[in-house]
Amino acid sequence: MKKILALLIALFLFIPCAPAEETAPVYELPVDFSGGYVPDPAAFTKDSYEDASLSVRMEKRDIDGVRYDIAWIKVSSPTQLRTAIAGEPNQVVAERPGRMARKVNAVVAINGDFYTQRKDGLIWRQGMPFRNLLNPEKDILIIDNQGDLHAILGNETQTAELTALLQSGRTIVNAFTFGPAIVKDGKALPMPETYQTRFDSAIRAPRTVIAQMGPLEYVFVEAEGRVQHSKGVTTDQMGAFMESLGVETAYCLDGGNSSIMLFNGKYYDANYTDSEREQSDIIYIATAVPNE
């Protein structure tokens, strides 16, 4: 019996141990105004960026006299969809979007809702509430802690919808008040009457849109306008285009002279050449991989 036991022990000692499973790296960023990591220069091409936490593909489409600048985005963590502001929270200051984007190491960026131009609205940035004054005439957009976009239409049920969202366990990371929401549940929405009569939504102009395709998958779009090669779009036209891309939710941000898209710190559109309008905020995508 002792010989058998000794043999079993000897066999056990000579059996190679299975290697311990390696833990997959977790890529995420703090929910604050600190910005992302410096992107890897070698991960850029003329129209793309890819690393372990992020994939961005840039595209231009010319359709019926309108140029659409498109950023197709996939991230590993909801914390990579971020906002940056000019100055400190609640300061009424403005800064060039390109400068803001470079300061936070944005891979791709678009303008936000220029919240300092108004005194109402639901305005949150990076988990911090700036303003909680709902305007039932305006649609709002919420980006929650899971990175999902929620378009809440401007009507009498707005407060109830917002309450239901928060009671579901989701929390607000970023909230915007501009609009209109142009796609919801995969379908283009008709232009609300208030936007048509008061907010120039029926005029062909440059437009900026943020949209969601699926979990942690987004599309930024700018329709160029007021330039020779592109005459701009109405919000109804923008909604039809976004629906054709297959997005689930799409929301208009500030447009006109505010519309801008940047990739790798440079203009991706032709609306800007030597100047850009100073604004209060941007929306951007950052890598969560430390570039040592």
Task: Give the ranges of each region predicted by the language model.
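Short, glycine-/Ser/Thr-/acidic-enriched flexible segments
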Residues: 76-78, 115, 148, 156, ...
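Zymogen propeptides
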Residues: 17, 21-140, 148-152
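Short, solvent-exposed aromatic-acidic interface loops
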Residues: 85-92, 155-160, 223-227
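Conserved, well-ordered active-site substructure
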Residues: 119-136, 142-143, 193-248, 252-253, ...
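Sec-dependent N-terminal signal peptides of Gram-positive bacterial secreted proteins and lipoproteins
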Residues: 2-20
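A short, polar/proline- and glycine-enriched secondary-structure boundary/capping micro-motif
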Residues: 91-94, 160-166, 201-202, 229-235
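Active-site-adjacent helix-turn-beta-strand microarchitecture at beta-sheet edges
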Residues: 113-200
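Conserved hydrophobic/aromatic beta-strand scaffold that supports enzyme active sites
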Residues: 68-72, 181, 209, 282
